[in-house]
Amino acid sequence: MTDNHAHLGWYSDGYHSPKEVWQAEQEAGIEEIVVSSTSTCAEKYKLVVREMRELIRLGGTRIHPILWLTPRMFHSNCRWAIPYMIHSKIRWQGVKMHWLAHKEWYHNRKLLHNALELAHWLDVPVLFHTGDFKECKANVFKEVCTKYDHLTFVLAHGRPLNETKDVLANCSNAYLDTAFMPVDHVKELAEAGFAQRILYGTDAPINQLFYEDMSTAEYIKNNISEMRNVLGNDLYHTIMSNQLYK
């Protein structure tokens, strides 16, 4: 079983080490994780590389690293960052952009193009955060998925639901992950014919910000149990076996 949306590093509730994250995922029964570092948002690129190296040391090929891109990485005063991370001997298996955290992606399409060209060069999927704000609603990415139809995109969180459904219906290169999604939304999308394009994800350990009295392992176990109960065996096993990052 793979958690297709996990994190490590600095976040508003403190620091989540590679060991903490990997142990929690394993305790919950997760075998592989697709993971990006929230330390990227503090532009701590060297720390990100150290974190990923340590996580890979712990988990080996069961770790699927995602390169979180920020606009600053493409600015002239910080252009060393991407080459540094690319040549870090980490085999990045996806790139991520968070348009709400970094609104410049929304306003600067040349910058976005450069980031997507990097994804094309790396030959990896692109993960977009989606949410209920104008910069990151799912339909914002419909044009991107259509224009860059040679790339594969993942809409993290699937928000808003109807817009996510519209993107999936019109863009065969679009997937979504279930991180922090209501399970009834997951079921609705699966029953609409998109089960093969739904990736299981948890957003762990960000859950600790919202569920302070529950461990990450317990949160994941509860989420998996709810998925199984609500989806039923067939849809549950289909979604849990989907794998995009390799």
Predicted regions, residues:
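Active-site neighborhood of phospho(di)ester-bond hydrolases with catalytic His/Asp-centered motifs
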Residues: 1-4, 34-37, 66-68, 96, ...
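Mid-to-C-terminal alpha-helical segments outside catalytic/metal-binding sites
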Residues: 2-4, 15-36, 120, 195-196, ...
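Divalent metal-dependent hydrolysis catalytic cores, especially in the metallo-beta-lactamase
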Residues: 4-7, 13, 19-43, 62-70, ...
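Catalytic pocket-lining loop regions of alpha/beta-barrel enzymes
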Residues: 104-199
